[in-house]
Amino acid sequence: MTIQLSVNVNKIAVLRNSRGGTDPDVLQAARTCIAAGAHGITVHPRPDQRHIRAGDVLALSALTREHAVEFNIEGNPFAPPRAGYPGLLELCRATRPEQITLVPDGDGQLTSDHGFDFAQDTTQLAELIAAFKAVGSRVSLFVDAGNPDIAGAAALGADRVELYTGPYAHAHASGQTDTALALFADAGRRASAAGLGINAGHDLSQANLGDFLAAVPGVLEVSIGHALISEALYQGLEATVRAYVDILRGSQVGA
């Protein structure tokens, strides 16, 4: 089975919002990604609306349903609603995405940079996971590869984990990948042993994706945004998505 590519279109919205108006068109960019072979679209609507907004979520939900590809909504389940942001649970109830990825990021974070700590009180998180699953979506939790209790995600009711791959990307850029890959491979094995599906994302790129997938068993899906959109500035969006799909086809699940 081919590992799935979900393209994160947040950066398209960042560019649009920097100028105001509707260009570049997030919906058209997503359409291009799907036509080029992307298996899904990811968004991370934040309470400060710095990129993806509630209206984008609704429109992209309709688009992905029309094209029969998966919609993945990321977000902090603890962030309260505020003006323009109805809250993650309400957005998911309105759109019923195939997957909801819960991320423990604060309002002031530039980007997601750590996973959940299952050593903390997780009663509220378990209740929220149950609420998100009641929407009809599978639930994935953002985790660090070094988390000693990745199996705790299964105990909380999650279906998958998304391995935070930022540390791997940094190690790859410095040419020091062996230790990082061993850590992620171990995390993948522990997740699989707990019955969890494995996703991966953050700073994955054409340069480092193949090595990661060759070393980490059982990855089902990668979510890629920043690097893909950056590369598309030089290579074109359609060609860039196709290049990622080619990498994934060469890295079959279970291969």
Swiss-Prot record:
It is found in: Cytoplasm. It holds the Pfam family PdxJ. 3-amino-2-oxopropyl phosphate binds at N8, R19, D203, G225, H226. Its EC number is 2.6.99.2. The active site is at H44 (proton acceptor), E74 (proton acceptor), H202 (proton donor). It is an enzyme of class 2 (transferase). PANTHER family: PYRIDOXINE 5'-PHOSPHATE SYNTHASE. Catalyzes the complicated ring closure reaction between the two acyclic compounds 1-deoxy-D-xylulose-5-phosphate (DXP) and 3-amino-2-oxopropyl phosphate (1-amino-acetone-3-phosphate or AAP) to form pyridoxine 5'-phosphate (PNP) and inorganic phosphate. This is Pyridoxine 5'-phosphate synthase.
